[in-house]
Each structure stands twice: as C-alpha cells, then as structure tokens.
Amino acid sequence: TEMQAACGLAQMDKLDSFIQARKDNFKYLRDRLKSCEEFLILPEATENSDPSWFGFLITVKPEANIRRVDLLKYLDQYKIGTRLLFAGNLTRQPYMRGRNYRVSGELSNTDVVMNDSFWIGVYPGLTKEMLDFVIKKIEEFFGVNF
C-alpha cells in the first residue's frame, strides 16, 4: 500500500546507520567472544567483502564436548534469543526421503551447520549493555572470564 511504501522510504534514510550499527555489533561480539574460541567457531567476513550482517553465526566445536541444545537452553533461561541456521543438510530433511537427487561429496560441513550452529542477533537497536549481557552468559556457560 502507499502507507507501507511511505514507511519503507522513511526507513531508507536510516539505512546507512542501520548497516553501521549491525557491523559495530558484529565486531563487538567477535572481539569479546574470542575468550570462548576454545569452544566456539566464530564468524568472520570473507576476504575483500563488506557484509551487512544478518546475525552472528556461532558454531559449537565438536571437541568442546557440549551439545548446542544445552547452550541454547541456557541462553533461553536468560531470555537471550537465538535462531537455528535456515537449512543445514537438505538431504536430511523429511521432504527429501524417497526423492532422487545427486550429492557431490560427504556434505560433512552441512551436517556441522545443521547440528552445531546457531545465530544470535546484531539488531541495530541492541545496546552495548545488552551485548555485554549476552557475552557474559556465553562466557559463564563455558566457565570463562567470570
């Protein structure tokens, strides 16, 4: 509708600040969660890229001996929102049963994403205090820096 278009156009004026806030939040999480790299694979930008981050993707390392679900339940206790990555290994989805398809390789990385990865937010409205709370709870879960 015209009203939705007007709202969208008004948001366009704020786009650069939204993108910068997402980048700043991503960098803040990345820098501060280095304390947990023994347990987690943290995201990083592809060389020569300049992403506007959707979220902060975290992967629990297999050698951490921690199940993703346990970390997610812990974060949920503190009202920290998380989301699973969209698909992971599509060949493991119920829809694919009984269908003919071709696979190139073992798809082991897609299994890792499906089983061990999740997002936390980098929404532009998050404050440093909010991000610090998320970081503190992740560090507490792993027994780091507290």
What are these regions (language model features)?
Residues 1-146:
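PLP-dependent aminotransferase class I/II
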